[in-house]
């Protein structure tokens, strides 16, 4: 009973300064769920009370004191990330026509990234979570550069229902973009297998000593549909240049 009264009082104090009932309830509930005793609950909620009363709750403060204020920054960040996914999905005409579905998918995609990150924990949670969300957001963006549009497997499968939004967060790049992953793997394999044997030719003039005694080799440094790059070495002065 005492704990219930204390929680009501804390909610009242927080909301008085934040003027945001939803955010107030989120902060208080997160602190309550993380605490297993009334003492720990008060330890978790104390920083919020102090900073609210002094009007010092800011993003900068949260980052400097991320351990104690982590519930606050995570809740705020998740809302921002969900909006980011919503705006990205709405760029596609399908989601422009289905706003409710767009909202649902944005929330589920963010949640899948959140749960995936929570299980990893190799880096700090916020850093890993932010990185993961940025990667997924790029993958589902329909406004990619022209040469990337054909590789948007994930967005097409999301629209068709083949891919569930709640599963995206834990999937690998190869699972989300099989076409792009296969293309990348093929290019890497081709480059590793290409012949780099040097040949001698008088076709290339050394810009250093002006002689035409050079060895050269062709290397596929760009996309497969673009010409190879020719690396030349002057046999006279040893200068290296691109032919």
UniProtKB/Swiss-Prot annotation:
Residues 77-201 form the TFIIS central domain. GO terms for molecular function: nucleic acid binding; zinc ion binding. One of its GO terms (biological process) is DNA-templated transcription. InterPro entries: TF_IIS-typ, TFIIS_cen_dom, Znf_TFIIS. It holds the Pfam family Zn_ribbon_TFIIS. A zinc finger (TFIIS-type) spans 202-242. Keywords: Late protein, Metal-binding, Transcription, Transcription regulation, Zinc, Zinc-finger. Zn(2+) binds at residues 206, 209, 234, 237. Belongs to the TFS-II family. Putative initiation factor. Necessary for efficient transcription elongation past template-encoded arresting sites. This is Transcription factor TFIIS homolog. It comes from African swine fever virus (isolate Warthog/Namibia/Wart80/1980).
């Amino acid at each position: 009973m005492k704990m219930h009264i204390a929680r009501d009082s804390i909610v009242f104090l927080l909301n008085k300064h934040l003027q945001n009932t939803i955010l107030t309830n989120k902060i208080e509930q997160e602190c309550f769920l993380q605490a297993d005793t009334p003492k720990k609950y008060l330890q978790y909620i104390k920083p919020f009370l102090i900073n609210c009363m002094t009007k010092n709750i800011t993003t900068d403060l949260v980052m400097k004191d991320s351990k104690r204020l982590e519930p606050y920054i995570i809740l705020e960040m998740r809302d921002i990330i969900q909006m980011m996914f919503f705006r990205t999905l709405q760029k596609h005409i399908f989601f422009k026509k289905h706003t409710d579905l767009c909202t649902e998918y944005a929330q589920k995609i963010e949640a899948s990234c959140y749960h995936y990150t929570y299980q990893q924990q190799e880096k700090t949670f916020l850093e890993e979570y932010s990185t993961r969300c940025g990667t997924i957001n790029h993958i589902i963006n329909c406004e990619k550069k022209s040469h990337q549009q054909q590789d948007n497997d994930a967005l097409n499968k999301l629209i068709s229902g083949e891919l569930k939004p709640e599963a995206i967060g834990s999937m690998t790049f190869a699972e989300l973009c099989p076409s792009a992953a296969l293309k990348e793997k093929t290019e890497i394999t081709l480059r590793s297998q290409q012949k780099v044997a040097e040949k001698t030719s008088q076709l290339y003039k050394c810009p250093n000593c002006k002689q035409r005694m050079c060895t050269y080799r062709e290397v596929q440094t760009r996309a497969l549909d673009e010409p190879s790059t020719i690396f030349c070495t002057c046999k006279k002065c040893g200068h290296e240049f691109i032919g």
